[in-house]
Every structure is written in structure tokens, then in C-alpha cells.
Amino acid sequence: MNNSEGLKSFQQSLADLPQWVSERLLQQINQLTNYEPVIGIMGKTGVGKSSLCNALFAGDISPVSDVAACTREPLRFRLQVGDRYITLMDLPGVGESGARDTEYAALYREQLPRLDLVLWLIKADDRALTVDEHFYHQVIGEVYRHKVLFVISQSDKAEPTSGGGQLSTAQKQNISRKICLLHELFQPVHPVCAVSVRLQWGLKVMAERMIKCLPREATSPVVSQLHPSFRTTVVREQARSDFGETVGAVLDSISAFPLIPAPVRAVIQAVRTTVVSVARAVWDFFF
């Protein structure tokens, strides 16, 4: 199905709806397709934030702010593929400076409501996690813990290091122990990931988990920014499903308008399944 056929199929699925309902739905879809996700990347100095972003995403990264690290305003980078954008926010890691951690707590409380996801990077050989644990439970807390995906970075530096072209069995065992430790300390909502950018290890699994962690409106825009090798069937189907569910949610919200006539509500409910199904089928047209 080419793009024009996809759009035609979707418009045909709306034929039984009143024009104002169709127009509102198309307006909401337009907002969705132009949605610009914001992903925070958190971690201590040298944890590998830049290398992970460059490995995951295909777009050109350009800074949109140039603020000194001593201020409460985090660095932002805008990533572009075609006409689509996402914003990456470089968030400082905690535990490196006691004087700064209080300031960082205020920064996080300010920024967390604006973020779709936080990738919290922890080096495979980092054992100083007491401050991280306290910060997670006290600052992130119950309200925002669903937005955090923990990522063990630089897994090739896990003991015993070899510098070879692949992880040893002993390293994989130690990484598994590290994953269990992080689950014990943080009790995260989402499974902990482990990656090595240098070895290109674990990135595909991480990309799939990242997409599952995002809110529905953010999955498709983020998928469009991923490096092609990470746009797996799992990733694409998750985005396709989320897009359909979002379209369905828009129809539900219109149907719930208090003054909407009962016959119009009945029509919306009658065509909902078909419209959602077609939206999933023509996802490639929109993204």
C-alpha cells in the first residue's frame, strides 16, 4: 500500500462519521504525528550518554541550549530525521558532588513532568549507588518511577575485563548480578537493560524495551528517529498498536462529550473498531 492509498483507506473508514468528528479526529492525528517527545538521559560523568544516543538514533543532533553545568537548566539537544524531531535532555548524575545534589533534586522535580522517559545510565563497574538509591526513592518517587528505564552502560567494562571483541561468560554472569542488584535497590517498574556500545551488545533489546516504556503518543515519533537496525518488528508493531489505541482514545473522548447527540455517539462507537484497525494498517503512511 502506497501513501496515497493509505490515506484514502483511512479517510474511507471515517465516511460514516459526521464531518466535524472526522475533522477533529484528523486534527488530533496531525498533532500526534507532529508530537516532539522529550527524553532525559541521566548519568554520572563518563557513563557514556553521548555514545549511547549516537548509537541508538539516526538523526543529526544539534544543541538547542548552551548552558553551563553549574546552572539549574539542563542541556538540550534536538534530534532531526526528515521533518520529525525529538529532544534529548542531558540530566546530571547524582552522587558526584554532595553540594550539587540538592540543586539537582530541584532540577529533576521541575523537569520530570515534561519528560516522556528518563534513561538512567549506570556504569557496569559503578559500585557507589547509595546516593542514587536515595535520590530515586526520594525525588523520583512513586509519581514518576514509571518514567525511568535503568540502563547498565559500558558492560564491556564489567569484571573481569578483557578488552576483547565480545563479552566473556564471567562478564555476563556479573552483569546478571548487577541487574539483580539494581532491581533489589531501586525496585523499578521496567526491567533493567544492559548494553555495550563498543561491542554493539544489548542495544536492540534496549530499544525494544525503551519503546514499551514510552507513553503511547511518543512511541511512533521515537521509532521514526531510531537507527534503522533497531526498528525491529517488535518495535514497529508496538508503535503501530499504540497509534491505533491513541486513535481509539480520541474517538472515545469525542464520544464522551456531554452534549453529543445519542445517534452520533452510536455511530462513533459502531465504527471505532474499524477506524482503529485501519489506523494500524496505514501506520506506515503517517510514520
UniProtKB/Swiss-Prot annotation:
Gene Ontology terms for molecular function: GTP binding
Name used for this protein in its record: Uncharacterized protein YkfA
Family note: To E.coli YfjP and YeeP.
Keywords from the UniProt entry: GTP-binding, Nucleotide-binding
The keyword Nucleotide-binding belongs to this UniProt entry's keyword annotation: yes
Organism of origin: Escherichia coli (strain K12)
Domain of life: Bacteria
Gene that produces this protein: ykfA
Residues that bind GTP: 43-50, 90-93, 156-159
Xref: InterPro entries: GTP-bd, P-loop_NTPase
Pfam family, one: MMR_HSR1
